């Protein structure tokens, strides 16, 4: 795909959604961090159902530590892998207090040193909480980038590298949200909704479907 097409795609996505953000509900960098840890192999909707009960009770590292492991599990037991996620969250809260004065660090190395936080989670927090031009590639973004040929790559790291290379700076802060929402609601895994897609004429997918 050439540069002109990419810029037109980004322009249309921006016109459709000028101020995109995550569908996870949060009111602080810490709440976002916990929500993103919980979202691995889970839906944002499922995470929001759990955190809307958890956060009014515990939305700081110390408050979650005060809940204890079993107390935390009682709030997140509807989410897949809740046992391991609870253990990671407890460890992360302890580290935030001991190493970061209870605050979420604004750098990748410190974030990725936290339990349950990998590159993708760190990218989401840096981008969404702090406005960094990072791009977290999940299954939706991976599919959209390869299917449309916007930024094809054999794995998520390659797609991330390609996106950082081909997306102009003015679009970098928002492109993660545009692509994830496009993949979640239009360019879905099975039977993509090509007929209602605002970038259908620019997409290079050879098996477009009319829906």
Swiss-Prot record:
- Highest taxon of the source? Bacteria
Q: Pfam families in the record, alphabetically?
A: EndIII_4Fe-2S, HHH, HhH-GPD
Q: Where is the HhH domain?
A: 108-127
Give the record's cofactor note, including how many are bound: Binds 1 [4Fe-4S] cluster.
Keyword Transport applies: no
Annotated [4Fe-4S] cluster binding sites = 187, 194, 197, 203
Instruction: Show the NCBIfam families listed in the entry.
Output: nth (TIGR01083), PRK10702.1 (NF007978)
Q: What is this protein called?
A: Endonuclease III
List the source organism: Haemophilus influenzae (strain ATCC 51907 / DSM 11121 / KW20 / Rd)
